[in-house]
Regions:
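Catalytic-site neighborhood detector that most strongly recognizes the C-terminal catalytic loop/helix
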Residues: 66-70, 154-178
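Short, polar N-cap/turn motifs at the start of nucleic acid-interacting alpha helices
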Residues: 48-56, 126, 145-164
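Basic, Lys/Arg- and aromatic-enriched nucleic-acid-binding interface segment
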Residues: 1-38, 42
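Short basic/aromatic active-site micro-motif
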Residues: 21-25, 102-106, 121-144, 154, ...
């Protein structure tokens, strides 16, 4: 999907279309590297983000004041989110209270998914912006991140992660941890 997105950026007609496609591209990466809900990503402001060094992961993006379903929490984004944040700061004219992603590119994402032949998954489920959160959760499970850690970062319960995601993990996915 990212490869198709990069091609669409190259083929953009005009500065505005290129900017919108870059924003969508970065929205996808940011979402997959934070596990945040779509509405949480769309509500994130520049002032909420701080880059932090971590011995294990390298650079992380700490996102404060994330208002989720049940509470306000802090989210830790992986290095991909750091890179997106740095690109957004460089590319966009912004103030601390401005949103990272001031608009939802729903139609653009649907077009991209269709062009990439990825609008539905192998089970026939429709993909959309919420799918990036699921991708984050599945990647973290496959990398051996404890369910409680994933749940805390995503603003979910361990039960939800176990019930809806962990059931898809196979022994092959866990070879390195076993």
């Amino acid at each position: 999907l990212l490869g198709e997105s990069e091609e669409r950026i190259k083929k953009a007609r005009g500065t505005r279309q290129r900017h919108e496609r870059q924003q969508l591209h970065d929205f996808m990466i940011f979402s997959v590297h934070t596990g945040m809900r779509v509405n949480e990503v769309l509500a994130t402001k520049y002032r909420d983000c701080k880059i932090k060094k971590n011995k294990k992961e390298g650079l992380l993006l700490v996102i404060q004041n994330v208002s989720g379903k049940n509470d306000i929490r802090e989210v830790i984004g992986l290095v991909g989110a750091v890179k997106v944040y740095e690109r957004l700061k460089e590319r966009n004219i912004h103030e601390p209270n401005d949103l990272l992603f001031p608009q939802h590119h729903r139609d653009q994402l649907n077009t991209l998914l269709k062009e990439a032949g990825m609008k539905t998954d192998t089970l026939g489920n429709i993909r959309n912006a919420r799918s990036f959160r699921s991708t984050y959760i599945m990647f973290r499970l496959r990398w051996g991140t404890p369910i409680k850690t994933i749940a805390t970062n995503c603003g979910n319960s361990s039960h939800v992660i176990d019930k809806y995601y962990a059931k898809y993990i196979t022994p092959k996915d866990l070879e390195e941890q076993l």
